[in-house]
């Protein structure tokens, strides 16, 4: 079991794990409350997977570390095991960018960290660099997860929005919608841009499209603002 210093497993996890672990189990997905409000209510929740068999795995990447299997996996989901995240909000993100750059340099065909690097450039307001890297992510043959591809497209749209290149922003938000029409996020971001541009009919249209999506998948991709 691997958790960070700013994470806490809720009581009872061991008994639940022992009751559900089978002889051929190698890895467990469980509930991760990545962000909580001041009353300890979850805001961002998804499954994570750092409970694993002792042998047959190794850790890779200098940041956003990945548990990489060297065996054939048999995974199970135990949603009643809950891990809460209590980050230090005063901690700087400045170390993430050079580590992600190092990670991508070491593994240039790793789609996951290419996506993370593009996102990190966006967070650092390096919008042109972010766009270039996110397009590289989309062009990787291994970048097949539609949710993450749509997020890269959405971040490209967001960067163009920040650069006040609104036509290109709209184009990429629409690409994100086409890639993953079952996610709220691209509809919401496009509606917000149309609100900024005072195109109210389109605000109403895309907001209603977002609200028609009721299912919130258990992945890290979901934005808080699409569901609050």
Where are the model-predicted features located?
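Short beta-strand-to-loop acidic/aromatic patch adjacent to the donor-nucleotide binding site
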Residues: 1-10
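Catalytic-site signature of metal-activated, phosphate-bearing donor transferases
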Residues: 9-132
């Amino acid at each position: 079991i691997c958790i960070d210093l700013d994470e806490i497993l809720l009581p009872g996890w061991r008994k639940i794990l022992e009751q559900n672990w089978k002889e051929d189990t190698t890895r467990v997905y469980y509930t991760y409350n990545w962000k909580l409000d001041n009353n300890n209510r979850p805001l961002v929740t998804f499954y994570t997977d750092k409970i694993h068999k002792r042998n047959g795995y190794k850790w890779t990447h200098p940041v956003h570390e990945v548990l990489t299997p060297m065996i054939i996996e048999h995974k199970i989901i135990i949603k009643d095991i809950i891990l809460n995240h209590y980050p230090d909000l005063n901690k700087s993100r400045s170390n993430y960018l050079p580590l992600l750059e190092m990670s991508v340099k070491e593994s240039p065909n790793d789609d996951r960290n290419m996506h993370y690097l593009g996102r990190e450039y966006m967070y650092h307001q390096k919008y042109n660099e972010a766009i270039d890297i996110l397009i590289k992510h989309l062009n990787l043959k291994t970048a097949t997860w539609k949710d993450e591809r749509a997020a890269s497209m959405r971040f490209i749209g967001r960067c163009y929005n920040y650069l006040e290149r609104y036509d290109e922003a709209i184009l990429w938000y629409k690409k994100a919608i086409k890639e993953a029409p079952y996610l709220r996020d691209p509809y919401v971001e496009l509606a917000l841009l149309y609100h900024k541009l005072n195109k109210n009919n389109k605000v109403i249209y895309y907001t209603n499209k977002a609200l028609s999506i009721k299912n919130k998948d258990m992945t890290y991709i979901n934005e808080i603002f699409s569901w609050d």
